[in-house]
Amino acid sequence: MKYKIDTPLTKYNAKEAIKYLFETENLTHQAIIIHQLNNFINDADVLIILRDYIYKNSYKIKKYSNSLDTCGTGGDGLKTLNISTTVALLLSSVDVPIAKHGNRAASSDSGSSDIIGKLNIKSEKNEFRLHQNMKKNKFTYLNAPLFYPDLAKVAQVRKLIQTKTIFNYMGPTLNPLGAKYQILGTINKSSAQIMTKILSRINLKSFSVFYSHDGLDEISLFSPTTFFTKNNKKINKKTVSHKFYNKYL
């Protein structure tokens, strides 16, 4: 059944609304649906429906699962540099295999693709070269719209909206190389809890989701940081004081 734009979006018609979102070229209609989907940012079922729809239409490549992604949700509005991309590059330099998934900025000034472009690192789509990069350099960058054409269809409207949307929660769940390890920063407790639920449902071997108590979607040097970490199928919660890190500065 085709979704009608004047119909309230519910959990039960979310699939039809999402299908229409990616089929229509009407920016106003796209914005209306995205704003309604934002009401379900803390609903794991709706997030999974959106994720699965985007994945279904993706460009599939052979997985390189023994890798780590540092893709976070972004959108904390604090105008920091792109820390997740910086961390990815640093980790790869000490031989941690990094499959960094990312996109251009939608609600900030420095998306991962913006940073990678400035560094003249090529965003690959070719499966052979992606795997060669992982073996040789321990790093490859995965530009989301190359693999997920549906994300390209909403790039313009997301830029017009200029605030964090439900799509901020998609990147960390859609690594094209199937990275089985994830470190993920997000903005607050509720975001961390919902991302923990989502990552638990997509069969990662291990992950750590964290938020800082000052609103930073990274580990803060100025306030405590709470972690939700999965190891051996168990999820543990731990809060670490910023003073722990400050003693190393």
Where are these regions (language model features)?
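Glycine-rich anion-binding loops and their surrounding alpha/beta cores
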Residues: K2-K4, L9, Y59, T80, ...
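Acidic, glycine-rich active-site loops and adjacent beta-strand->loop/helix elements
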Residues: G72-G77, G102-S108, F147, H213-D214
